[in-house]
């Protein structure tokens, strides 16, 4: 099939990455349509969320490069699949990753389904990742060339079927090159800053935002030996390994969050970056999603990331059952956080990932969440 007979629907956010994605595909002769996804109702947020402004930028870019554009509303799907998950995880004392869930449920599910109804052969986004295909229809996901921007961590839940319909035109490029192309073409978004933070929070204070949806309950801040060190303002506001915002004075090493007790509403803290309570030897994770089937019965040696932009750690992965894996680390790892993603790699190939449930030392489960 020639490029001009291949319809690619581009998810456009109003940012520079998706703008250049659409431009490159148009230049390559594809039949390109731009779609702006409205995932969050910004009418009651005092204008902080910039959906209207972003859509105007999408319109400007699409008019510049000469492609049709539409806006589609996924607010209900987003609320049901991403935001309620986000709140439920915080209620459990965990630290969720809404970007992973947004990619899984919205950008590569609701949006993909919508694009197929428009006759799309592929969808494309401005993510920094790569898709490798062969003649037999096999698909692999690879890290983006720009190490600093690689987004495979957030795409770890994509299935083989989803990836077979996806293009990532920026995956082989550095961010600086993307900016250069945008400037050369004088795209409306060329000088726009990269967005930061979770889409539905924007630049607002996270603590303030969360308290609108979940009631906070203050409680004791204690060492693992039970010594009271202060008062916390609500367990959901703290994450494992957190240093700032504890309000513990005095001399010596800084203090860090090492655990939570939901039943007694206690936040555990200990002193020192390398405190033993922050280190673990293995984890159990669920919601396992692998791009391609891998036999994990005898253990797979590969590498893993436990948070975005972290260096890879050598691990051995064993399947417990259909939905759970055990990941053993070659060396103890610091501040692994339940609710976050563990993402598996074989060299530059992203194998898939899972959601961290429990973290252990060889001697037994840590006190991260009791």
Swiss-Prot record:
Residues 149-151, 307-308 are annotated as: Interaction with tRNA. This is tRNA-specific 2-thiouridylase MnmA. GO terms for molecular function: ATP binding; tRNA binding; tRNA-uridine 2-sulfurtransferase activity. ATP binds at residues 11-18, 37, 126. The keyword Cytoplasm applies. Catalyzes the 2-thiolation of uridine at the wobble position (U34) of tRNA, leading to the formation of s(2)U34. Disulfide bonds join 102-199. The record marks 127, 340 as: Interaction with tRNA. One of its GO terms (biological process) is tRNA wobble position uridine thiolation. Belongs to the MnmA/TRMU family. SUPFAM superfamilies: Adenine nucleotide alpha hydrolases-like (SSF52402). CDD domains: MnmA_TRMU-like. Its EC number is 2.8.1.13. Signal peptide: none annotated. The active site is at residues 102, 199. PANTHER family: MITOCHONDRIAL TRNA-SPECIFIC 2-THIOURIDYLASE 1, TRNA 5-METHYLAMINOMETHYL-2-THIOURIDYLATE -METHYLTRANSFERASE. Pfam families: tRNA_Me_trans, tRNA_Me_trans_C, tRNA_Me_trans_M.
């Amino acid at each position: 099939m020639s490029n001009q007979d291949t319809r690619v629907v581009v998810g456009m956010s109003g940012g520079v990455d998706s703008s250049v994605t659409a431009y490159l595909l148009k230049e390559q002769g594809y039949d390109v349509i731009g779609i702006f996804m409205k995932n969050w109702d910004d009418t009651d947020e005092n204008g902080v969320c910039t959906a209207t402004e972003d859509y105007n930028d999408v319109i400007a870019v699409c008019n510049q490069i000469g492609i049709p554009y539409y806006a589609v509303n996924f607010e209900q799907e987003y609320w049901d699949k991403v935001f309620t998950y986000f709140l439920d995880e915080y209620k459990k004392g965990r630290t969720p990753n809404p970007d992973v869930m947004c990619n899984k449920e919205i950008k590569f599910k609701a949006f993909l389904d919508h694009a197929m109804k428009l006759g799309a052969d592929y969808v494309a986004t401005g993510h920094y990742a790569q898709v490798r295909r062969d003649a037999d229809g096999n698909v692999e996901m690879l890290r983006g060339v720009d190490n600093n921007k690689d987004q495979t961590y957030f795409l770890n839940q994509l299935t083989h079927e989803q990836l077979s319909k996806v293009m990532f035109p920026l995956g082989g490029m550095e961010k600086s090159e993307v900016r250069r192309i945008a400037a050369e073409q004088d795209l409306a978004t060329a000088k726009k800053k990269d967005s930061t933070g979770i889409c539905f929070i924007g630049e607002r204070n996270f603590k303030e935002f969360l308290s609108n949806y979940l009631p906070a309950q203050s409680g004791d801040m204690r060492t693992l030996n039970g010594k009271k060190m202060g008062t916390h303002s609500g367990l959901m506001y703290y994450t494992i390994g957190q240093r700032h915002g504890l309000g513990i004075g005095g001399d010596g090493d800084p203090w860090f969050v090492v655990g939570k007790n939901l039943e007694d509403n206690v936040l555990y803290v200990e002193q020192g970056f390398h405190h033993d309570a922050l280190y673990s030897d293995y984890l159990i994770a669920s919601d396992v999603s692998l791009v391609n089937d891998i036999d994990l019965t005898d253990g797979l040696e590969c590498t893993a990331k436990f948070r975005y932009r972290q260096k890879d750690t050598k691990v051995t992965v064993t399947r417990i059952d259909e939905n759970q894996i055990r990941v053993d680390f070659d060396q103890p790892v610091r501040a692994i956080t339940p609710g976050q993603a563990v993402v598996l790699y074989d060299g530059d190939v992203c194998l898939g990932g899972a959601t961290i449930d429990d973290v252990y030392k060889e001697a037994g489960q840590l006190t991260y969440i009791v």
